[in-house]
Amino acid sequence: MANDYPSSDEEIMEAQTGSRKRRKTSSDSESDTAPRAPTATSISRVKPAKDRAGHQAASRVAVSKASVPEENGKEKVSFASIDVAPWLVASLASMEIKRPTGIQKACIPEILKGRDCIGGSRTGTGKTVAFSVPILQKWAEDPSGIFGLIITPTRELAIQIYEQVKAISAPQSMKPILVTGGSDQREQAIALASRPHVVIATPGRLAEHIKTSGEDTICGLRRVRFVVFDEADRLLAPGRGSMIPDIETCLSVLPPKEQRQTLLFTATVTPEVLALKSQPRAPGRLPIFVCEVDTETLATPASLSQLYLQTPVTHKECYLHVLLLTPLNLTKSVIIFCNRTKTATLLEYMLRMLDHRVTALHSGLKQQDRISNLARFRAQAARILVATDVAARGLDIPEVGLVVNFDVPRDPDDYIHRVGRTARAGRPGNSVTFIGQRDVELVLAIEERVGGKMSEFEEEGVSVEGRVVRDALKIVTEKKREALLNIEEGRDVKGNRMVGMKKRRVVE
């Protein structure tokens, strides 16, 4: 099928949030169901977060945390000390990965012992290495295909995992393949039939192969030794746009769970994920290993500075232009998150007209454009990436200095995933959330979830409002109008008319 499931950013968010209570959107989301503004005529500061301990105790299933080996000045834990094979230790060292993170120290030894695993850790802590290393080590001891299947919700995540597995396994003749939407299905069927060692797939496209490609293509899946669900909370979320039907199709051709190891990794350990722990085990099977490292107490990175900026809905683009040009942010790599594809498209067009080096990533783009745009941003050919929540999870984009929430996310967990794109691996980072009068309830829910309070963005000695009026109001309004016209006329971001493209109307 041409597109992976779900096909739109709204459906992607539905799949991620599942049956959790929806929060109403801001007025910029073009919805009549926006939350009612507070009675106060203005907000000078966001209210402090409430004590969340009672709420968390009531809403989450209690899980005993795995004990993680501690490092001290005398003895530091290494990959060799947790039984990783020498060739893998050398391969990781060549990638400048020399010491295991908390999730890696806890999970790798247990997976090597043959245990199923549920691993939870915040973004940027090396979960991909935590499941890739034991799979590669076991494969090297008994090479066969298809040895491992890794299922992940988005194409970009699948590509990233594919590249990382390929890099780690470089010293060996390992053959991984990608099975995602947006690529030729016939070529993928041939690759699957050739018995690759590891398959990295999105659930929609793999399910399509299982239904249509024939037994010769999928028979290798019947002997899989490892199955990994990356971003498991999103894969298993119920509700509209759920990926569960496709996952059930994938599981239908795999060996019984007693004959394979199942690994689930996520930054957000949801009740749907934890429910798998209580499933009955076959006699003689080791208990499921459950490890949560920093999923609650450090949901956002310690080196992250979380800021907010009050913006009138009618002039948000002006404030964004000014924010990007402040001396503090002028050289930073920036990701701007929007709730809607239309908003992301408009911002990309407008910012390009304002001479920013910008690209975009969202479900409205063709697969090849998504790949090339992400590559441009990673190579710093583009300084700014305008994205929807397609880019919020798992993508390892180094050196992102600033995350801007142009729209307040509807769900607090989406906020955690967004701001987790910066301040990775202990590096400092900033996030700025644009807040309108109707967004206060959403922000308070975010503060309660992360257990902290946002600070107001300030530029020393400068009035942001003054800069907007003086430097941005006229030019940004003009360029926004031009951008809307180009989109309506079916022109691309460079202003060229797209062949065969019908006119599109974008509602402001």
Swiss-Prot record:
Pfam families: DEAD, Helicase_C. The keyword RNA-binding applies. It is an enzyme of class 3 (hydrolase). One of its GO terms (cellular component) is nucleus. One of its GO terms (biological process) is rRNA processing. PROSITE patterns: DEAD_ATP_HELICASE (PS00039), HELICASE_ATP_BIND_1 (PS51192), HELICASE_CTER (PS51194), Q_MOTIF (PS51195). Residues 323-465 form the Helicase C-terminal domain. A motif (DEAD box) lies at residues 230-233. The keyword rRNA processing applies. SMART domains: DEXDc, HELICc. CDD domains: DEADc_DDX49, SF2_C_DEAD. Gene3D superfamilies: P-loop containing nucleotide triphosphate hydrolases. Residues 57-67 have a biased composition (Low complexity). ATP binds at residues 121-128. Residues 1-68 are annotated as: Disordered. A motif (Q motif) lies at residues 77-105. Residues 108-287 form the Helicase ATP-binding domain. The Q motif is unique to and characteristic of the DEAD box family of RNA helicases and controls ATP binding and hydrolysis. Belongs to the DEAD box helicase family. DDX49/DBP8 subfamily. This is ATP-dependent RNA helicase DBP8. It comes from Phaeosphaeria nodorum (strain SN15 / ATCC MYA-4574 / FGSC 10173).
